[in-house]
């Protein structure tokens, strides 16, 4: 199971590299999807079921909408592809560092899991994250304020990306 988490960490790092190093917003959006999905699986592995679901909905539901609007307003007829020697060198270095970390800490994680195996763990059905859910839905005002805050963020990004002229109609 640890190797699955390591794969998600590698996917997370590669997604961050694609977002940072990509010259075109289309490929950055693809990297953002990799970062969101792998980060949510890492949170899910550590026991945050509701938190990972909320993060997927926020990243892929809210941030991708803003990213699509931004990409539509700054559309390139011929987007540049991610590539080059520097990027491949970065990818190989990240994979080597992750592999070296996995090999050096592999025995440590096995010792910790063996030590925790004999412990008397009595976990309940409800985790600590459910307390935040009840607080969030107990007062409906918080939900309304969160929705308005996301709407204001969307419009502020659209104003920033709009440009000097007529916004999305400038290509027409």
From Swiss-Prot:
Domain of life: Eukaryota
Keyword set, alphabetical order: Electron transport, Membrane, Mitochondrion, NAD, Respiratory chain, Translocase, Transmembrane, Transmembrane helix, Transport, Ubiquinone
Pfam family, one: Oxidored_q3
GO cellular component assignments: mitochondrial membrane
Enzyme class: translocase
Transmembrane feature ranges: 1-21, 25-45, 48-68, 86-106, 108-128, 141-161
Record's catalysed reaction(s): a ubiquinone + NADH + 5 H(+)(in) = a ubiquinol + NAD(+) + 4 H(+)(out)
Signal peptide: none
Entry's EC annotation: 7.1.1.2
GO molecular function: NADH dehydrogenase (ubiquinone) activity
UniProt-annotated location(s): Mitochondrion membrane
Membrane topology annotation: Multi-pass membrane protein
InterPro entries membership: ComplexI_Subunit6, NADH_UbQ/plastoQ_OxRdtase_su6, Nuo/plastoQ_OxRdtase_6_NuoJ
The protein's role, per its UniProt record: Core subunit of the mitochondrial membrane respiratory chain NADH dehydrogenase (Complex I) that is believed to belong to the minimal assembly required for catalysis. Complex I functions in the transfer of electrons from NADH to the respiratory chain. The immediate electron acceptor for the enzyme is believed to be ubiquinone.
Family membership: Belongs to the complex I subunit 6 family.
Alphabetical list of PANTHER family matching this protein: NADH UBIQUINONE OXIDOREDUCTASE SUBUNIT ND6, NADH-UBIQUINONE OXIDOREDUCTASE CHAIN 6
Listed name of the protein: NADH-ubiquinone oxidoreductase chain 6
Origin species: Petromyzon marinus
């Amino acid at each position: 199971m640890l190797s699955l988490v390591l794969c998600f960490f590698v996917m997370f790092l590669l997604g961050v590299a694609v977002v940072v190093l990509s010259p075109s917003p289309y490929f950055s959006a693809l990297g953002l999807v990799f970062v969101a999905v792998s980060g949510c699986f890492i949170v899910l592995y550590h026991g945050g079921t509701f938190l990972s679901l909320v993060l997927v909905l926020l990243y892929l539901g809210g941030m991708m909408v803003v990213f699509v609007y931004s990409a539509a307003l700054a559309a390139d007829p011929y987007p540049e592809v991610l590539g080059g020697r520097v990027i491949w060198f970065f990818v190989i270095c990240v994979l080597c560092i992750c592999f070296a970390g996995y090999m050096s800490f592999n025995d440590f994680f096995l010792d910790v899991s063996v030590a925790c195996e004999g412990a008397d763990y009595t976990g309940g059905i409800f985790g600590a994250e459910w307390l935040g859910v009840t607080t969030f839905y107990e007062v409906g005002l918080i939900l309304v304020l969160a929705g308005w805050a996301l709407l204001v963020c969307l419009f502020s990004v659209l104003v920033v990306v709009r440009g000097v002229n007529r916004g999305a109609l400038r290509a027409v």
